[in-house]
Amino acid sequence: MDSYTNKLLNTIDYYGFKMSKVKKVEFVMLSTLERECNNYGSSIDEFFHYMEKKDFLISEEEALNALPLPLIMKAVDSIRREKNISKHTISRTMDMDRSNYQKFYKSKGSINFSSFTRILNALDVDLLSFLSRCRDIKCGLIE
């Protein structure tokens, strides 16, 4: 496994999972979804209502817990290639974000943050776009 893939896995894994368990369980993105909604001044209910209204065809179950790690990795790589972002740039961005988050949360007495948000930031993509990409890959529309 190359260092980029390892760093990506460790970033996803940074809070709450041991790597041996990650391969057996699906990654839960609830904290990321809450953070994204808060960033835009809305609630999770509003988010799902918006998705239904716009016919994005992403169910609540898919958004929260139906994203196995291999699918997440494929989506990250697909977006990275499409946007022509180097693995080095993503790695560097994740490292800088980790440092910034740790400084902020250490001052609050906690480091409970969504590490997945750092990957979205590094790819410069919002959660909805990421979920749509996952669905396209899952349905075989994108390799």
Where in the sequence are the language-model features?
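Residue-level signal for the short linker/turn that defines the boundary of a DNA-recognition helix
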Residues: 17, 28-31, 42, 74, ...
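Short alpha-helical DNA-recognition segment
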Residues: 3-29, 84-103
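Short C-terminal boundary/hinge segments that cap the last helix of small helical domains
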Residues: 41-59, 124-143
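Residue-level detection of the helix-turn-helix DNA-binding "recognition helix"
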Residues: 38, 52, 81, 95, ...
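A short, Lys/Arg-rich alpha-helix, primarily the initiator
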Residues: 1-17, 54-83
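Short, basic-rich loop-to-helix N-cap that marks the start of a DNA-contacting helix
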Residues: 25-39, 108-121
